[in-house]
């Protein structure tokens, strides 16, 4: 912000910590000389909340901060508002607990990665340094920078790093991960 590279921040966090970002982390860690407007997204919008949300689009020198629950990005209303915010600002978009975007098939993951491409800068945060699977890293890295891991798709990434086996479940054939390779 001080260097003029951003004028907006979109923080996406799990339900359990989203309010803490708004009430605790931002007031505690944002330096005093930065004038800012912070708004916490809520799914049911009152007139006051709508006024607060609209204030994020007023011109001025303030840093505009939108804090959203990750679940909001599973809804059209939430995605549309985040997209409007991103298109109106030079934004840093941060995902807290980035393992919430590990499933490449999930609608929410697809929405968040698409929104991330509209942000000037992206960051991921997690308190879980070890994932359940190396495959969990693909979409998190894709959010940061498409192609970062050198693969055009999740499936080419999976082919390189996962040992797959075909299994039958109720007459349906599916690929399951049975191990990993090329991890060094």
Set out the residue ranges of the language-model regions.
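Conserved Helicase C-terminal RecA-like lobe
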Residues: 1-14, 73, 86
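Conserved P-loop NTPase motor "coupling/switch" region that bridges the ATPase
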Residues: 6-9, 27-38, 42, 49-50, ...
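Conserved nucleic-acid-binding Ia/Ib motif block in the N-terminal RecA-like helicase ATPase lobe
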Residues: 12, 17-60, 64-65
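Conserved helix/coil segment N-terminal to the catalytic DExD/H
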Residues: 46-66, 70-89, 103
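Short N-terminal helix/helix-N-cap motif within the alpha/beta-hydrolase-1
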Residues: 75-78, 102-110, 133-135
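Residues immediately C-terminal
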Residues: 100-103, 124
């Amino acid at each position: 912000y001080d260097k003029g590279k951003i004028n907006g921040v979109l923080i996406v966090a799990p339900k359990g910590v989203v309010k803490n970002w708004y009430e605790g982390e931002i007031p505690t860690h944002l330096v005093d000389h930065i004038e800012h407007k912070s708004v916490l997204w809520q799914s049911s919008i009152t007139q006051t909340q709508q006024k607060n949300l609209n204030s994020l689009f007023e011109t001025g020198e303030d840093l505009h901060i939108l804090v959203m629950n990750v679940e909001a990005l599973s809804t059209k209303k939430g995605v549309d508002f985040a997209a409007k915010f991103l298109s109106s600002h030079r934004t840093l978009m941060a995902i807290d607990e980035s393992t919430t975007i590990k499933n490449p098939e999930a609608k929410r993951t697809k929405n968040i990665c698409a929104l991330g491409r509209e942000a000037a800068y992206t960051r991921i945060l997690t308190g879980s340094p070890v994932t359940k699977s190396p495959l969990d890293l693909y979409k998190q890295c894709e959010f940061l920078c498409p192609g970062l891991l050198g693969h055009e798709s999740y499936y080419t990434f999976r082919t390189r790093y996962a040992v797959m086996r075909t299994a039958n479940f109720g007459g349906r054939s599916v690929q399951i991960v049975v191990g990993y390779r090329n991890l060094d």
